[in-house]
């Protein structure tokens, strides 16, 4: 889990590491020691966050992990499209889980930053332009969200996404005041899941509240 993120999503479950200045950094040498002990037991390393692509040294870290014989995965929300393109173009990533949070017009309300939507959707296009890299496109929904989940999924499918996951937000680790549910919310999310299932993804994953 890499510290820091430029966005401020209300349902973020890793809000404790959004500030890159917090203590608790693990030395890279300690991570290499751990991987050396786990060789043959682990298939790969997933770089997550926060926002992993915020870290300038991410490419070098991925290259080192590959040298050690592990596969490389990446969780990203896509705020840095050019960095993402460089990582994929260099062949450093085997799998990407990319979060797409809303349609373009609703993005700022979710991510809390202007221009976030343009960057995220550009990043999705970059991921889908690399068919050699496995992907999972993810949408997290919550009661006070924009309610555009089907439109998000349909647009991702039009762009060529093969695997799509609908995730129901939980309140574990989220900022104070976040509400993960309301009366009838579970039924609404299940209905949305059924609608998205009609879009004919190669694989559709529903991560509900249980």
Task: Walk through the language-model features, giving the residues of each.
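Conserved AdoMet/S-adenosylmethionine-binding subsite of the radical SAM
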Residues: 32-44, 53-180, 184
């Amino acid at each position: 889990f890499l510290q820091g993120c430029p966005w401020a999503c209300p349902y973020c479950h890793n809000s404790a590491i959004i500030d890159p200045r917090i203590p608790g950094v693990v030395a890279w040498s300690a991570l290499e020691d751990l991987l050396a002990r786990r060789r043959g037991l682990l298939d790969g390393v997933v770089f997550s966050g926060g926002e992993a692509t915020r870290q300038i040294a991410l490419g070098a870290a991925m290259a080192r992990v590959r040298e050690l014989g592990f596969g490389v995965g990446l969780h990203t929300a896509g705020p840095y499209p050019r960095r993402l393109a460089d990582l994929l173009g260099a062949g450093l990533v085997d799998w990407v889980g990319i979060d797409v949070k809303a349609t373009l017009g609703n993005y700022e309300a979710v991510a809390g930053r202007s221009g976030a939507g343009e960057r995220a959707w550009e990043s999705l296009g970059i991921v889908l332009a690399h068919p050699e890299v496995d992907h999972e496109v993810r949408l997290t929904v919550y009661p006070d969200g924009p309610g555009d989940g089907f439109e998000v999924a349909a647009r991702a499918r039009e762009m060529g996404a093969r695997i799509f996951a609908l995730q129901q937000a939980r309140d574990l680790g989220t900022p104070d005041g976040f509400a993960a549910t309301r009366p009838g919310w579970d039924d609404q999310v299940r209905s949305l899941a059924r609608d998205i299932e009609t879009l004919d993804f190669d694989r559709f994953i529903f991560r509900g509240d249980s």
